[in-house]
Amino acid sequence: MKVKKKKKEDFKEFRNNEKSAYKTFKIPLKTILLNRDTTQPVINHLVFEMNDLVIHTYQFIRFYVLDKYTKIQPLPTIDETFILYCIKTLGTRDNRGKKGKDTELLETLEQFYKTEYQPLLNHEKTNLKNTTFLLPYLATQIHTSLHNNFQEHFIQHFLRFINKTTNQITEDKSILFQFKNKCLSLEETDIIFDDWKNIHLPNILPTEIKKSIHYDIKVRPFEYLKGMLYMNSVLEKQESKLFQPLPLRNNIIPKHIILDTASIINLFCPEKDKDGNKTKKGELLSNVKDNQNEIWCNFLDMKNKIFKNKHYQFHNQIQTDGISCCLLFIRKDLKDKKWGSRVPVLQEQDFHTIEDLSKEQLDTLKDRNIVGCDPGKHSLVYMMDKKGNKLEYTASQRKIESYGKRNQRILLQEKKKHKIIEKETRLSIQNSKSVNYDKFKVYLVEKDKLNKETTDFYKKEVWRKMKFRQYSYGKKSIDTFLNKIKETFGENILIGYGNWSRSSQMKYTMPTLNKGLRKLIHKKYDTITINEFYTSQKCCECRNPLKHYKDTKGVEIYRLFTCSNCVSCENKNIVFRTRDKNSAINILNLTESWIHNQTRPVEFQF
């Protein structure tokens, strides 16, 4: 079944200058917080409590689902309501307020908590007082995490499951490749796989799949929960490597929580004054919109320059981990939107290929300084123009400039000093990905024990400060690089940007910017996409194939090539080509060739 691609709009201009509806600014919390001595400890305590609550919520959901799966009972519908009920089950609150609609589910969860979860971990419920408006945000975040896990990883896990369970049927990769594609598109497959399909597919795929698995997993991802558990159970019996069917929060460094106006009122406005008289807390909560300006003026320094923005205004919501703070802003022309009404969604920036431009549009680019840009994993971008000016931005450079490497070293030293590594190593014996109910119980006990032993270490402010510092210096590193582009190549430039990209993370390498870096460059400079076909394999001068350079031991040198055709007849010197520089020059030449002649050299045609 062919998937219809969304038709790209005709090229009109390089970028969409329309402003997004929302914007966030990340700054240190202490720079805008009023009455720091009294308010920051309250926020810190809440951050710690909610982080612990979220950790247990992930574990409780997984434990409850495994219990149902093991007993061959219907799995729960994992929506925000179910997650919110799980959160409430793990906490205590008074009996005032609106009762839950599904009392049967609440009672079932409470019973499971009392009989299974609480005795296992000796868990103490979290005090949920003054968190009424915060809990739905936590439920949404957890739901999004679970939802994304299914959408992003089910296909990958399904294909790996096929690899691991079809060894006895065929080892022919081409036959297996066709079988995988036909399975995903729900087409008839080779009869040699009939027994395999009868055994496994009913346990993996839901009924009434629409169009294809690729489409259906996006529409109703939680229908594939049973399949994820089944595949993991089969792999576990085979003693193969497992995947995570339902994610857990294993990192216990406190994370950000969302605070809105109602949450601020609940936290900092007492119900009664010193004399025992009722305050206006109830009145404020019943009329939040009219009082929100007054509330935030008493909580944050609204005279701070961060709030003075020409196009945006503060939208009465923050995210904080007690150290850093993300302020939510809304466009001023949308500030009076009605509750529930939709705001205009800014379309994702289209990166047009050079073939999308008409001859008239190409003619306007002839006086530009063309820059060839080769994106990659280790060298994030390597740029070069026809004058020989070059600029490179590497993953290692970014890691050092953002203090990422320094932070890793400090964390490792402190973990060794406090013997945290020894404690965490003990947990590695257990498997958090197991779907065996008893094995997962053992893991939960060991993980909870470890969390209690290390929680004081990870609650230290230094880890959250380092995370914020890494974010800040990472932005500074990018800004410095963007300014260097102008210094190196001038203002009137057109960047021919190679179309290299990866859809998944490369093994044994750190995560790096790819499309995100392209977006940042494109915001400031005009870029056009160039097909990279053969640009790293053929010489930038003679266009003949390059060969890897080998040392005296016959070992290929990383990213270093030689061109036998460009060797001088007089001195027989070897001509070396570095992969990135060679690609950048080829991309530059392809860009210029299309602008002036609307043709692609024969050697680079596909």
Q: Residue ranges of each PLM-predicted region?
A:
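Positively charged, helix-rich recognition surfaces that bind polyanionic ligands
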Residues: 2-59, 65-74, 78-606
